[in-house]
Amino acid sequence: MTSNFRHVALIGKYQASSAGAIGESSRQALDGIARFLQHQGCSVAIEVETASNTGLLHYPSLTVEDIGARCDLGLVVGGDGTMLGIGRRLARFGTPLVGINQGRLGFITDIPFDTYQATLPPMLEGDYEEDSRPLIQACVMRAGQVVFEALAMNDVVVNRGATAGMVELRVEVGGRFVANQRADGLIIASPTGSTAYSLSAGGPMLHPSIPGWVLVPIAPHTLSNRPIVLSDATEVAVEVVSGRDVSASFDMQSLASLLHGDRILLSRSAHCVRFLHPQGWNYFATLRKKLRWNDGDP
């Protein structure tokens, strides 16, 4: 078979234990995928941290920047968290990503591990569905200076401390004052993140084709304070008015401690994450499967 993707990078979440050991099954799984790709005519490299943690050093290893510059495809083996992390880092290169699920839900790593040998060959020949997901560009402003910057694919969450009371947050959209919200926190989620923490907090699911965000209060003091869907073409600003131990998290993978008066500015990034799915993939089938809709129906 001649693959449309000649240079493929494998990225996995295979963290070494405190003793430096790693499960043999995890190593074998990644090695098996690499050998399979080689049999499909692909040149295979492994992301450098993945290679180090698995001990798979007989393949070329590449940094994320090298993957973006030199590889036609990234194959992510793990769960949604693994995909979120690498997706943010590769978005600026436009490298397409395919996910093989070894996590739990697998909303964005949607190929089951036990089916990859049947699913991948048609995709490597160009038979796939492409799906672009926008990123949120966020920065924390303090006294007029940027003190923290991050990208998020899922969400930005402003939270109170674990032992603190409610926070008060001033919310502006497009430079217009919306409200001061008293709550345990506030979630600003993309369509991708609308099926994550936002959904658990009572927010709606946004179809990935919708160019919008959803603002979801966490346990608000006022019951009329409900989620609101916004266009992602406008900037959202969230200012910390009061509260102790307030922080902002970005995809739950990076964290910024906040002070009173800090402003979190959010806008749509210029970069998108490119997902490739098996032919016939659709969003509603994913919802049915992952959320177990219609379980028990004949």
UniProtKB/Swiss-Prot annotation:
GO terms for molecular function: ATP binding; metal ion binding; NAD binding; NAD+ kinase activity. Its EC number is 2.7.1.23. GO terms for cellular component: cytoplasm. The active site is at 80 (proton acceptor). Signal peptide: none annotated. Keywords: ATP-binding, Cytoplasm, Kinase, NAD, NADP, Nucleotide-binding, Transferase. The keyword Mitochondrion does not apply. It holds the Pfam family NAD_kinase_C. The keyword Thylakoid does not apply. NAD(+) binds at residues 80-81, 154-155, 182, 184, 195-200, 219, 253. InterPro entries: ATP-NAD_kinase_N, ATP-NAD_kinase_PpnK-typ_C, NAD/diacylglycerol_kinase_sf, NADK. Its cofactor is a divalent metal cation. Gene3D superfamilies: Probable inorganic polyphosphate/atp-NAD kinase, domain 1, Probable inorganic polyphosphate/atp-NAD kinase, domain 2. It is found in: Cytoplasm. It catalyses: NAD(+) + ATP = ADP + NADP(+) + H(+). It comes from the Bacteria. GO terms for biological process: NAD metabolic process; NADP biosynthetic process. Belongs to the NAD kinase family. Involved in the regulation of the intracellular balance of NAD and NADP, and is a key enzyme in the biosynthesis of NADP. Catalyzes specifically the phosphorylation on 2'-hydroxyl of the adenosine moiety of NAD to yield NADP. NCBIfam families: PRK02155.1. PANTHER family: NAD KINASE. This is NAD kinase. It comes from Verminephrobacter eiseniae (strain EF01-2). The lineage of its organism: Bacteria, Pseudomonadati, Pseudomonadota, Betaproteobacteria, Burkholderiales.
